[in-house]
Swiss-Prot record:
This is Isoleucine--tRNA ligase. A motif ('KMSKS' region) lies at residues 595-599. It catalyses: tRNA(Ile) + L-isoleucine + ATP = L-isoleucyl-tRNA(Ile) + AMP + diphosphate. Its cofactor is Zn(2+). Monomer. One of its GO terms (cellular component) is cytosol. L-isoleucyl-5'-AMP binds at residue 554. It comes from the Bacteria. ATP binds at residue 598. It comes from Streptococcus thermophilus (strain ATCC BAA-491 / LMD-9).
Length: 929
């Protein structure tokens, strides 16, 4: 036997190298086969419910880092709730209708208009479901625990029927109406868009300054007067029917030198416009308030048969332009509102593909709307005063990345204005985890217009509306419920497979159809109505979930998307918000803080992270950043996270190894019988437990990460475990001192493994497999630890916190001695302490082996004068010299009692007593040399 074998060196097969890319799929397969998710739900049956409702990602392509961050965050929350006494099933979902899938099929060569509608929809459905399967595997590979066998998918018959019923309740309350309002129109998609489907980019546009001649001045202006207007959309001049002025804005009538014409412009803008138009010596003839110009008639710049009426508009400002806005009610929301209020004609001169129509005039018909500025300028002739190219923020179709226009077309709307206050009142009841989130959603609802819910596309849920022979829309409770039942049985494809009369209840009649003939709506619903109905299709209809849901958690872009549409439909149906709490996340940016883009080559695929580091590192990264704001990710950042993981893993490996001979049932020591330092560490750990439990409760992942890493690196590794080796390696295996420390080790090991489970389930499960005395076969089936309180813990903490301050000073003194080559390692030191009365009382009260705690071979508490050479601090001074004696081959301390023993060992008296007591046979025979 060798001397080294008398040490209690920790033994474990738990590997230092994690091998996560290979091990994670093995664990995931085992969990699936053992039905761990289902068993967790069974364990929690009858407990308080917690419903985190999954916002459905769009089923197209592999998941990206943003998807991963979101789903991992949800998984951490649901796992922590499941381990905290809540019944918290997690039903993942997918959004499956919409234009992107139509575009994919088009790229694959599918000709939509050459196919039967039902056949085309089947192709869309098959593609969508293939993407659901692909993304499901992506999410499972992240270690997300969910009911993967029973997700919700917005194309299933039960979901579509639930969506129709949401629509039906809104129709019943009078919230659904048809109108020809201007809407965001995407010529590239040939469809109306919702606000959530637009994004803003800079665009260079041609802006024109031109003049309308006064036709009837109403006794205020002469007919040789011209009113100057500005437009950034020249094509809309073809449909201009009015000029809007601000009622309280001051306007001036001016005559520039050399001009026979007189002009009206906003007084505030006269100087800048004079420079722009090269007007010199401008004579101001008169001033007017805007309301004095109201109802003056001007003529269209190139069509004298068309009148343009001066009207008042609250949207008019003097921030730019001329202070007068040309009004084309068919091409703008403000234009429409003020135009209709003043009886202006609503004219639309652009078709669904962005092509100018016949009613624009022969010079324009057949041309693309964005290419007609030169024709407009030619038609304006000397009425054109200036032309500029301007760069401004402009709305684009978020899918095709092409600019859009406002265009009045017959559409179906959901009225928000009818119950807006009810929605705002519900927002006040929701718990937001950021105040700016509440303000953002509140302002969006307060300021938004009615919701355009119709789309002129193929792949989606049909609007369940019929038309009588006289074109009266029909959407009664009876007809809508009948359609819902048909969808429930056959899916929405039946809408396209049957004639209208076969979709109506048997024997249905309507006064508008004396001949019994009916037609059906061809438009589909906005996809935001699809996902916005999920509270009904999933949360209400799944018995394991509770409505309203406890939490919605998505990216901050969903304030105008899913958060918004879900809120509107839920309040419209039931008068309540669909969520009790709302939590939003920022976007994942690259390492430089730039937006990720395939074209820039700066994207990081979750699959690449899994191959290089493992999903655990991606999961740990999610907790290491503040996800409420935009976050950065790169392979370098993940390498740093991987290093944190390595430290966590190796620390826990040390605890596993050094409790391998510990049975918590027979060997554990009661708290009151622990040494003071062990009690201190137990109390500090329980403070960590409380902090982490609170952080889980408040979804504060970064707090968990920082608390955990700090505890492991600073309090455990750099303090407790640092000196613990002297005890657990050197003392007798069954000694009280060793068992005291092992009690603390085991308690921390078991509880920290549980605390880590929501974040690092694969690693926690691997650790758990080495804990033979724990009852649950999977750590996921255990409960998170509760923080304990101990008698006199505040006094104990105060004392040991003071010691930690003292320890920091002692370490500085040792470091100085090391720098001066007095010692090498701290174990070579004899540390002499010169304390004041307060520090001396503290050290004596600890009743502990200070040399052991400070990892020195000898320690003296001295009285009397402090030597000149001492390192001085407030309240205490130190001297450091080399300890006397020889190095013990067993404990590595320098000890004056170290000598060669008769059994071939050069060791100190303390180690000799341990060997002679526990290894009598070796003492007799001697150690191997």
């Amino acid at each position: 036997m060798k001397l080294k074998e008398t040490l209690n060196l920790g033994k474990t097969a738990f590997p230092m190298r994690a091998g996560l890319p290979n091990k994670e799929p093995i664990w995931q397969k085992e969990w699936e086969e053992a039905k761990v998710y289902q068993r967790r739900q069974e364990l929690n049956q009858g407990k308080p419910h917690f419903t985190l409702h999954d916002g459905p990602p769009y089923a197209n392509g592999n998941i990206h880092v943003g998807h991963a961050m979101n789903k991992i965050s949800k998984d951490i929350i649901v796992r922590s709730k499941s381990m905290s006494g809540f019944y918290a099933p997690f039903i993942p979902g997918w959004d499956t209708h919409g234009l992107p899938i139509e575009q994919v099929l088009a790229k694959q060569g599918v000709k939509r208009k050459e196919l039967d509608r039902a056949e085309y929809l089947k192709m869309c459905r098959d593609y969508a479901l293939s993407q659901v399967d692909k993304q499901r595997e992506d999410f499972k590979r992240l270690g997300v625990s969910a009911d993967w066998e029973n997700p919700y998918v917005t194309l299933t018959p039960d979901y579509e029927a639930a969506q129709i019923r949401v629509f039906g309740e809104m129709a019943k309350k009078g919230y659904i109406y048809q109108g020809a309002k201007p809407v965001y129109w995407s010529w590239s998609s040939e469809s109306a868009l919702a606000e959530a489907e637009i994004e803003y980019h800079d665009l260079v546009s041609t802006s024109l300054y031109y003049a309308n001649k006064v036709k009837d001045g109403k006794g205020v202006l002469d007919t040789d007067t011209y009113i100057v207007v500005w437009t950034t959309t020249p094509f809309t001049v073809t449909a201009s029917r009015g000029l809007a002025v601000g009622a309280d804005i001051e306007y001036v009538l001016v005559k520039p030198a050399g001009e026979t014409r007189k002009f009206i412009v906003a007084s505030e803008l006269l100087n800048s416009l004079s420079e722009k138009f090269a007007w010199e010596e401008v004579e101001v003839l008169n001033t007017y308030r805007g309301d004095e110009l109201n109802q003056i008639v001007t003529e269209h710049p190139w069509d004298s048969e068309v009148d343009e009426l001066v009207i008042l508009g609250e949207h008019v400002t003097t921030d730019s332009g001329t202070g007068i806005v040309h009004t084309a009610p068919g091409f703008g929301e403000d234009d429409y509102n003020v135009g209709v209020a003043n009886g202006l004609e609503v004219v639309v001169t652009v078709n669904e593909r962005g092509i100018m129509m016949e009613n624009a005039g022969p010079d324009f018909a057949g041309k693309f709307y964005d290419k007609v500025a030169p024709i407009v300028m030619e038609k304006l002739g000397d009425l054109l005063l200036a032309k500029e190219e301007i760069s401004h923020s402009y709305p684009f179709d978020w899918r095709t990345k092409k600019p859009i226009i406002w265009r009045a077309v017959p559409q179906w709307f959901a009225s928000v204005s009818k119950f807006r206050q009810e929605i705002l009142d519900e927002i006040e009841k929701v718990k937001f985890h950021s105040e700016w989130g509440k303000v953002r959603l509140y302002n969006m609802i307060r300021d938004r217009g009615d919701w355009v819910i119709s789309r002129q596309r193929a792949w989606g849920v049909p609007l369940p509306i019929f038309y009588a022979e006289d074109r009266t829309p029909i959407m009664t409770e009876e007809t809508i419920e009948h359609v819902a039942k048909l969808f429930e049985e056959h899916g929405s494809v039946i809408w396209w497979e049957r004639d209208a009369k076969d979709l109506l209840p048997e024997g249905f009649t309507h006064p508008g159809s004396p001949n019994g003939e009916f037609t059906k709506e061809n438009d589909i619903m906005d996809v935001w109505f699809d996902s916005g109905s999920s509270w009904n299709g999933v949360v209400v209809n799944r018995p394991e979930l509770t409505y309203p849901a406890d939490l919605y958690l998505e990216g901050s872009d969903q304030y105008r998307g899913w958060f918004n549409s879900s809120l509107i439909t839920s309040v419209a149906n039931h008068g309540v918000a669909p969520y009790k709490q709302l939590l939003s996340q920022g976007f994942a940016l690259d390492g430089k803080g730039e937006k990720m883009s395939k074209s820039l080559g700066n994207t990081i695929a979750p699959s690449d992270v899994e191959k290089q580091f493992g999903a655990e590192i991606l999961r740990l990264w999610v907790t290491s950043v503040d996800t409420s704001n935009d976050v950065r990710i790169s392979m370098d950042i993940l390498s740093q996270v991987s290093e944190s993981y390595r430290k966590i893993r190796n620390t826990l490996r040390f605890l596993i190894a050094n409790t391998s001979d510990f049975n918590p049932t027979t060997d554990a020591v009661a708290f009151e019988d622990l040494r003071s330092v062990d009690q201190y560490m137990t109390i500090r750990f329980n403070q960590l437990v409380k902090n982490i439990r609170d952080a889980y409760e408040n979804f504060e992942f970064l707090t968990i990460y920082k608390s955990l890493v700090n505890f492991i690196n600073v309090e455990l590794s750099a303090f407790y475990l640092d000196f613990a080796k002297d005890v657990v390696y050197i003392e007798s295996a069954k000694s009280l001192e060793r068992r005291q420390m092992q009690t603390v080790f085991y308690d921390i090991l078991v509880k920290i493994t549980k605390l880590l489970t929501p974040i690092l389930p694969h690693t926690a499960e691997e650790i758990w497999s080495y804990l033979e005395f724990e009852n649950e076969d999977y750590v996921q089936l255990s409960e998170l630890p509760e923080a304990e309180d101990f008698a006199n813990q505040d006094a104990l903490l105060e004392k040991w916190n003071a010691f930690m301050d003292f320890r920091g000073k002692a370490q500085k003194a040792l470091e100085e001695a090391r720098n001066e080559k007095v010692i090498g390692k701290s174990l070579e030191a004899h540390l002499t302490i010169y304390p004041d009365a307060e520090v001396k009382e503290l050290l004596e009260s600890l009743n502990t082996n200070l040399a052991q705690l400070l990892i020195v071979s000898a320690l003296t508490i001295a009285e009397g004068d402090v030597p000149e050479s001492a390192v001085r601090f407030q309240g205490v001074s130190f001297t450091v010299e080399r300890a006397e004696g020889e190095v013990c081959d067993r404990c590595r301390r320098i000890d004056p009692t170290t000598k060669e023993r008769s059994y071939n060992a050069t060791i100190c008296n303390h180690c000799a007593s341990i060997i002679e007591e526990n290894f009598a046979e070796v003492v007799a025979e001697g150690f191997e040399v």
